[in-house]
Amino acid sequence: MSCSCNTAALRIFVRNVANIQVPSSQQVTPRALSGIYRPRTTTHLPLHTRSLHTTRAARTDSTDAVSEEANQSEPPTATEKPETPKLLFRKTRSPPNPEWKAKNLPQRPNYHPRDYKKKPGLDVDDTPKEELKKKIRWRGLPEEERRELYAKAGKEMPDEAERQARKQERQAQKLKQSLEGAGGRGGEGGEPFKKYNPSNPKREDWQHQKNALKEKFPEGWKPLKKLSPDALEGIRALHKQFPDEYTTEVLADKFQVSPEAIRRILRSKWRPDPEEEIERQERWFKRGTQIWQRYAELGVKPPKKWREQGIKPNKYWKEEDKEKTFKDRHIANVRLHRSLL
C-alpha cells in the first residue's frame, strides 16, 4: 500500500501540468468538510515538530480537491436549484427603449402657425394673404388690364369712390371695436371706463384759472408800478391789523396800484428763503440806484440814503432851469415818468 502523501502530490502535479480532471476514489469525510472552513493560522512551532504534521496537511489538501471535483462532476438534481453566483456590484438597469416615447405620445396633427386665423375683433378684413397680394399687384396695373383680370375672376372692378367708402367704413369699425374693448373691461367697482372724447378732454384747475386771466387781461399782466418787498409786507400787515379800515380800494389808492394787484398781494402765500431774500434786497438796491441816478441827472435832489451812496444832483441843471419855462419842466417830468415805467 502506497503512502497517501506521495500519491496526492503526484496527482496534483499531473493535473496542473496536463489540465486533466482525474476522479478520485476517496470519499469525502466529515473531517475533510470541516477542514474547508477551518481558518488558516500561522504556526509558531519549531522546525523539528512541523514535519510530524505534513502528512495530515497533504491529506486534507487532497480531500479538499477531491470534494471540489465531486461537486463539479455531479449534475444538479431536479429538487435542488443551481446556485446563482453572487454579484460583486449592483445590478445595472436595462438600456432605455427609444421607441416608448413614440408609442405613448399622442399623434399631433400637422399644422402651420400661419394657418390660424386672427382673433376676432382685431382685424376686420379677414381676406386670405394670397388675395391681398393679388389686390396689391392689380392696383399698379392700368385700368383696362385690371378690368380684364376682374372679368376673368368673375367680379366687378370697384370704383375709386366705392373703394374709399369701404376703407373709411373699415377704419370706423376698427375704432368702434377698440373703444368697446377698452370700455368693456370695467374699472373699480365693476363700472365701465368712460370713453375718451378728444374734443372735450378733462381740464385741470390751473388751466381754468389761466383761461380766466386771459379773458380778464388779453394783453397780459402789465403792472404800471412795481412795489418793493418792504411795501408788500406793509400792505399785508395793514390789511391784517385793520381789515375794515384798509380795504382793497383804500390800499390801491394809497400805494397807487390797481385793486387787482392788491388782491394778488393779499392772496399770495409765497415767502422767500433767506438766500432768496438776500438776492432780492441786492436786486432792489441796484434798481434804486439806477432810478435815482436818472432823477439826479434831471436835477431832482435824491433822498439822504441815496446821497450817502454817492448820488448827487446835476448842478448845471439848476442854471438851465432858470431859463426854462414851467411847460418845459412839466414835459421833462412826464418823459422821466414814462422812462421809469
Curated annotation (Swiss-Prot):
Region of interest: Disordered: 37-129, 149-217
Pfam families from the UniProt entry: Neugrin
Transit peptide, residues from-to: 1-60
GO cellular component: mitochondrion; nucleus
Primary localisation category: mitochondrion
Domain of life assignment: Eukaryota
UniProt family annotation: Belongs to the RRG9 family.
Ranges of compositional bias, category Basic and acidic residues: 112-129, 149-172, 201-217
Signal peptide segment: none
Biased composition (Gly residues): 181-190
UniProt cross-references to PANTHER family, sorted A to Z: NEUGRIN (PTHR13475:SF3)
Record's protein name: Required for respiratory growth protein 9, mitochondrial
Compartments it resides in: Mitochondrion
Disulfide bonds: none
Keyword Mitochondrion: yes
Annotated function: Required for respiratory activity and maintenance and expression of the mitochondrial genome.
Keywords from the UniProt entry: Mitochondrion, Transit peptide
